[in-house]
């Protein structure tokens, strides 16, 4: 309940971090729990942990689409992941995987990096500092993983026809 209420206050929350997605995990045999970290009664990080048993004794833990946290705040990120690591060790978790939904670099509709665009390479550096390893950024599909590249469209102030007509001809053809 507390987790759901917190999600309602965060702009960056995605479906994969929702209690609805937790129910899907549970239906598929995962054990799910929600944790949060706070400082002076202010929540600064939270996440949904999903566990699967490994070899009857150990566990694999997956944090779908990452923590709800400010990845640019290096100190709090390191503090949270350090506490999380200790917590998971007590639960016999031997592998933690996460795939945070972070806009790494701005790309155009063809997937090319936009010149003089925003980037979040510092976020990747902060996660590495917190002890995470980055898997290679590969294009293509891997059905065992969430997609690595996501596109988003700003829908504000546009009609459905304007949005649809801005798609490439192949995308328009495939969505009719």
Per-range role (PLM):
Residues 1-21, 176:
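Short amphipathic alpha-helix that is part of the acyltransferase structural core
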Residues 1, 45, 123-176:
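Acyltransferase donor/substrate-recognition loop-hinge adjacent to the catalytic core
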């Amino acid at each position: 309940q507390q987790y759901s209420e917190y999600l309602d206050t965060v702009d960056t929350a995605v479906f994969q971090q929702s209690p609805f997605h937790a129910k899907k995990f549970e239906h598929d045999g995962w054990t799910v729990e929600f944790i949060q970290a706070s400082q002076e009664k202010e929540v600064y990080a939270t996440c949904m942990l999903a566990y699967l048993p490994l070899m009857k004794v150990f566990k694999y833990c997956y944090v779908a689409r990452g923590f709800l946290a400010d990845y640019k705040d290096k100190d709090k990120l390191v503090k949270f992941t350090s506490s999380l690591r200790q917590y998971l060790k007590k639960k016999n978790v031997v592998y933690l995987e996460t795939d945070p939904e972070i806009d790494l670099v701005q790309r155009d509709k063809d997937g090319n990096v936009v010149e003089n665009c925003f980037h979040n390479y510092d976020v990747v550096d902060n996660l590495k500092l917190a002890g995470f390893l980055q898997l290679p950024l590969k294009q293509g599909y891997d059905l065992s993983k969430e997609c690595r590249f996501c596109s988003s469209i700003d829908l504000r102030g546009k009609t459905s026809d304007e949005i649809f007509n801005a798609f490439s001809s192949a995308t328009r053809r495939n969505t009719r």
